[in-house]
Amino acid sequence: MATGTRYAGKVVVVTGGGRGIGAGIVRAFVNSGARVVICDKDESGGRALEQELPGAVFILCDVTQEDDVKTLVSETIRRFGRLDCVVNNAGHHPPPQRPEETSAQGFRQLLELNLLGTYTLTKLALPYLRKSQGNVINISSLVGAIGQAQAVPYVATKGAVTAMTKALALDESPYGVRVNCISPGNIWTPLWEELAALMPDPRATIREGMLAQPLGRMGQPAEVGAAAVFLASEANFCTGIELLVTGGAELGYGCKASRSTPVDAPDIPS
């Protein structure tokens, strides 16, 4: 049940809304009074949220399939008659891969999901967003700006999402459509848990992830959701921005080389 009215009467589409960050965004918009369309290619999570949250509906959609995306937009308009906000959250972070372990085919598939899925939905939604003078929120990643080891394809796709956000903000400003992105850092999600489980010491990996932030913890999906509602509602003078939801992970100096790296440190004269 909605507990607020910050976005009451508005209609929001959230891709990848069935779990993790997407589910946190769905909950935040429902709690702000919006009607939310949950888009996901995994039916189980989306259906469960639909049953749990009055004001939310689920539409099965794979954002890499343009026909699915066309149906998503047309069905949203058929049901609600308007569209005020699109949150492009659907994406994937593959397990760690050295550059020589990646493939062009795998890179293309990740581009289809992380970048072109965002492009396709945004393009098809723009006629309706222009009518409502709505907004687009793209979920990028901190690593799109600062890099990440053993993640070349992922980092490239997320850097492109941030760049596309800024370009689209320029193109859509004359229509009153705002375009922003959120770049999360370490957010505790099922995906993070799955990736940690692949490591030799999952507990140590999780601890390392927590200590990467000056705040000493990972973020929660609800905190990304709160940022999305802010961008959609109060942030009327913000367009083309990258809002970092990172716990300060990008701040300060840190050890970048492996601790086993041989170094020839100079002696300090006594």
From Swiss-Prot:
InterPro entries the record matches: NAD(P)-bd_dom_sf, Sc_DH/Rdtase_CS, SDR_fam
GO biological process: L-fucose catabolic process; steroid catabolic process
Xref: Gene3D superfamilies: NAD(P)-binding Rossmann-like Domain (3.40.50.720)
Binding site for NAD(+): 19, 21, 40-41, 62-63, 89, 154, 158, 187, 189, 191
Effect of residue 158 to A: Lacks of activity of testosterone 17-beta-dehydrogenase (NADP+) and estradiol 17-beta-dehydrogenase [NAD(P)+] activities
Subcellular location: Cytoplasm
Matching NCBIfam families: PRK07231.1 (NF005559)
Function text: Catalyzes the NAD(+)-dependent oxidation of L-fucose, yielding L-fucono-1,5-lactone, which rapidly converts spontaneously to L-fucone-1,4-lactone. Can also act on D-arabinose and L-galactose, with lower catalytic efficiency. Does not use NADPH. May be the initial enzyme of the L-fucose degradation pathway in mammals.
Protein name (Swiss-Prot/TrEMBL): L-fucose dehydrogenase
Originating species: Homo sapiens
Name of the gene encoding the protein in the UniProt record: HSD17B14
